[in-house]
Amino acid sequence: MNKTSLSILFLAPLTVAGAAIAASRHAERVEALPPVKVQMPIVGDTALAPHRFSDVQLLEGASRRHVKTTRSQIETTDTAGYFKLSKPASGRVVETLVTTLRPERFIKGSLKVTSASVFEVMVDGVSKGSKAKPDSAVTASSVVAVPIELEPERTADIMVKVLTDSEAKNDPAVKIEFEPESKYSDVNYSLVPEKKHRFSIYDMSDGPRARSTSMSPDGKYVITRFVEVFSEKEQRTWSTLTETKTGKIINASLNGSAGWMPSGSTLYYTVKRGDSYDLVNISLPSQSSETVATGLPTGDIIWSPDASYFVYYKYVPGTRKEGIMQRYSSPDDRMPENRDRYYLMKYDLSTSVAQPLTYGGATTYPDGFNADGSKMLIKAMRENTSEYPFYKTDLIQVDMKTMAVDTLVKANGDLSSAVYSPDGKSLFIVGGPSLFGKLGVNAGDHPIANDFDSQGYLFDIASKKVTPMTRDFDPAIQGEPVWNASDGKIYFRAEEGFFVPVYCLNPADGSIKKLPVAADNVANFSIGNREDRYMSYTGQAYEYAGRAYLMDLKTGKSTVMADPDAERLAEVNFGKTQPWKFTASDGTEIDGMMCLPPDFDPNKKYPLIVYYYGGTSPSQRGMSHAYIPQLFASRDYVVYILNPS
């Protein structure tokens, strides 16, 4: 799109195809689901007369909100606006009519359903009103009015369930109409049985997603972990187990807490039993389970490479701030849990003895083991209010046999992570550009480098020599890297404008290669630490979220392992997204992305929203945040997202 074509974006009156100027208007078409026969229950106690079973209760069990059928058909009304339904030859039948209501602007009004038959009205899957008794003819009592309030371009799913009776005196019929309040009489709206709805905040927050994957150390199997959100308070989680060679799911209901033992392809999980935990191993491919240890002090385990011991956190509550006057030792001390601490414990499986590894001072974090488990990295960060960047980080190497410690790094700022090389002689450290003075800084004339521009450094343990590996590499490293023991290369995610791909760094020559991942925004990835054939990952874009992939690293081909939200999102009418760059007055090229409204008409003008995140990280392609452009575009805005970072 060039600069001239951008003129279509300025504010002008809006219209929606198929919408009409608002007034009381009846639905002319609905989707009719296949009829379902129902029967009265066996009634055995007349003492319940005050709570006698009513006809409308037959409709309550026929929700049908999620019915999936190819047999539904579109029904049209007669000249009076009624949908004529068939009277059953015998007994009673539930007829279900479905439509949608969508306004261009905010609207209030009443959904009115009229029928002499018994019926129930549902809006967005929730019962909003019903008529409990049949009439011999349509009267004033045959009308049920449901108040409706809708945001602009918000779709309301309407379902009317009608109980038809072979013994009824009249032929069943139903009328569905919407009457706006007088102050909203100029708002356009549609009342049609659309197959697709426009994107809503619930499409962003709800639904099933693959949230992470975990590959076995030998690369033969992948755990995929899922979450499905139903509401703010309701969700479910589950896991599956997939064989990488065949792509076959060999366990569709894997224990949700299952993880990998440090080598091979043995699964483990813990079971709480009283005040302690049992350790259960699952052998593959047989999937037979065995309890291999009991009496463990925790279920949250960080395994050593040889599985002879594990490390876990011990929580130590800090002193509580009480009284009306508070003395804060630092800005961070304003946070309620700032004085709480988490220290590290070591549990030896052969002796069943738990030994403290750290205690006192700042909270300590484990940062991984060398290949044989004889050494461990521990990180501690503390506040330093007297000088920028206001935090200091110590990286300490611990000899797990003698408890001797060696402080490898005393850094200014946040040292995000560190990982051992396969031979244990080097580390790959991720942190800000100023972590080691000016070694990682590439900020031109700016006096302070962007701390969010995370860099990668090679650190030689014996000599303490630091080599910046990504100073001239534009993307910023994200998350924890993986130093693969099979090919000797380092894998990491990186922010690259709107995208978050995965890169592979060869520490021998410093070359960096982008992997051809299929997702625009990779949320996480997993590689077996002793193989280099497969990589699993999850990702999202503007039109999908929570997909799980398996990549063959030899061919670069990715296959979709799971896309649980595909069916639900197929019912969403997304707006088209396209890149749009321009050159600023100082000559800087500004990267940008444009999202057009669904059903965009290039001959019309639209209001424009420019979204510019003022932080130091770029905006990313995805639909799992509150400022997703699809949400604004669904309200008939053109959305332009700047990425000047």
Would you name each region that the model predicts?
Residues A23-F83, T100, M159-R198:
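Accessory carbohydrate-binding/adhesion or oligomerization-edge regions at the termini
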Residues F106, V123-A173:
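Beta-strand-rich ligand-recognition modules
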Residues G207, F226-W238, N251-A252, T270-V280, ...:
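A flexible loop/linker signature enriched in serine peptidases of the S9 family
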Residues T213-Y221, S257-L267, I301-Y309, D367-M376, ...:
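Blade-terminus and WD-like Trp-Asp/Gly-His loop motifs, strongest in beta-propeller folds
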